[in-house]
């Protein structure tokens, strides 16, 4: 009698069970060709997750190849658990962003928590100690109960995991739009620091070397999680709650500390997190990168309950697990270490020279697959795109009611203060946070030095929807400006591409054009892509999200002394750097007045971005600028109001713009506060006003004046989200 009751080879083919797992007929036939026979149930499951969109990037790989991935600073780029970039003194910064969109839509707390846990393990698997977390979130409008529930759950999950494991959440962004109803975006980023000689790779090599499993015992949670993340959300998605993993931050903390100790052992050959596709992806990818084979004895895998089959073990996405390859004969040294940290561990296999991926359970073979086709030869699909029709109509902005629009935009949750939400995150644990949440970028000191790492995470949606190529440039440039605004030198970036179904021509074209724009911006701004993630099929009931590329970018501050007095003071002069044009297409103003965004804006000049960026950075480092704020969503008037509300300072400004241009979202602009007695030596910079301590906010363009108490602004800006979130459900 067989140990495990599973469908037969004949049943799999006759009933097309492979289709339920995510394989097409053509893909199944390709598996048959690779194996030279019909696959069994476990093998079908393994191919289905490894060839899923989430793991193989089969619809996006051609576009990812156009991203620049090297520079004088890049030590390790795409292909490993995270990117590694040199910061001098034989140290490096390690970082990556990942999505956990589908799980968060079904189980918001655990979906978000495990997203945080997974990205932390990616950083730790390189050998780096995490120093901070960031997140980029998108939800539907908060007037819907479902969206409030998702927002609460996701924010609580992020805070719950990060706070318990002891890593501060220092920056992020949150936006709200009906296009994310039922399909939130949860993108988590982690940044770590490592010494050059501690950098690890996920590789399995050395015939006879042992494979060690460490972490939580394997259960049935998260089975086919990678496949689930590669499908559209539907009414049936609720039934896939078992595909959502369960996180345990306390075990995560133990695993992190044990791993960081294990990397100091010279006998460690390779290490990889068990993330999407669990034991399957970690083991097969390590073997492929090592040019080796691997034999795993699944009866040695620590399991949570009796009767878990090889199929379930290989596809489980139980959290808090790592896979190591260690030199033969040194296994006990590692097992003793993990025992000291109260972690389950076991030797479950060895590296071979067969280039085959072999799984046995009590000597019975459950899979025998060539490594390279499994890990590296998933089919790649190049589809046909179709550009969205250009809107040639004109919107009328000649009679904008400035004061009415001003208050409505300031109170919109996308623009309003997110303090109510991010206060749930521990921002200071570790005591190295220099700049707390609320500004454009976070700054975290590199312990034992006077250096700091600045990091930011930024997404773009409406502009990418309207004009994908320009929108792609914009999202990279926005992250670049946010680092410049704290005086950092941008080094490199990670990206998460969140889109709908690539099988829809318009969405596929958005993917083509926006990644082309991103690649161009990366080249000009000298910010290579060192890691990333793709999340497609973000659709609910046939409606796609806006195409939303998210960029995480890091920069270096060589000496943080200037940050000791980097905040505005009464008496500072305010300057506007950058030109204000009639850029209303895709703006908050267009959405407010016309209910949708379907017009284009001016092209972004990347060479100007570099020139202005260097000038701004010099003003900061020369001690002339006391504060820099990028002009973002809502435009110039909203940016000044946010500045005033955040710092509790008055503003007296006169702007040479029309009423509508007060809300223009022209790219490449900064507000610079310059210390009393100093001047800003930047060509075409306009002095527009003064920082006051009179509690008054006053901005005029000679035609219209907006005047409010700063306390009133603060009530509107700070109070908007709490009011939405505490509405009666």
From Swiss-Prot:
Indicate which residues the UniProt annotation says bind ATP: 57, 96, 495, 532
A GO-annotated cellular component: cytoplasm
Pathway in which the depicted protein is active? Purine metabolism; IMP biosynthesis via de novo pathway; 5-amino-1-(5-phospho-D-ribosyl)imidazole from N(2)-formyl-N(1)-(5-phospho-D-ribosyl)glycinamide: step 1/2
Amino-acid positions noted as binding Mg(2+) 1 in the UniProt annotation, renumbered to this chain: 98, 533
Q: Which residues bind substrate?
A: 99-102, 121, 245, 317-319, 535
Main localization of the protein? cytoplasm
Q: Specify whether Magnesium is a keyword of the entry.
A: yes
Instruction: Spell out the subcellular localization from the entry.
Output: Cytoplasm
Catalytic reaction(s) noted? N(2)-formyl-N(1)-(5-phospho-beta-D-ribosyl)glycinamide + L-glutamine + ATP + H2O = 2-formamido-N(1)-(5-O-phospho-beta-D-ribosyl)acetamidine + L-glutamate + ADP + phosphate + H(+)
Which residues does the record give as Mg(2+) 2 binding sites?
122, 273
Q: Name one GO molecular function term.
A: magnesium ion binding
InterPro entries reported in the protein's UniProt record = PRibForGlyAmidine_synth_PurL, PurL_linker, PurM-like_C_dom, PurM-like_C_sf, PurM-like_N, PurM-like_N_sf
Pfam families associated with the record: AIRS (PF00586), AIRS_C (PF02769), FGAR-AT_linker (PF18072)
Q: Which residues form a coiled coil?
A: none
> What EC number(s) would the UniProt record show?
6.3.5.3
Function text: Part of the phosphoribosylformylglycinamidine synthase complex involved in the purines biosynthetic pathway. Catalyzes the ATP-dependent conversion of formylglycinamide ribonucleotide (FGAR) and glutamine to yield formylglycinamidine ribonucleotide (FGAM) and glutamate. The FGAM synthase complex is composed of three subunits. PurQ produces an ammonia molecule by converting glutamine to glutamate. PurL transfers the ammonia molecule to FGAR to form FGAM in an ATP-dependent manner.
By sequence similarity, the record places it as follows:
Belongs to the FGAMS family.
How the protein assembles, per its UniProt entry?
Monomer. Part of the FGAM synthase complex composed of 1 PurL, 1 PurQ and 2 PurS subunits.
Q: What is this protein called?
A: Phosphoribosylformylglycinamidine synthase subunit PurL
Q: What species does this protein belong to?
A: Staphylococcus carnosus (strain TM300)
Q: State the gene name recorded for this protein.
A: purL
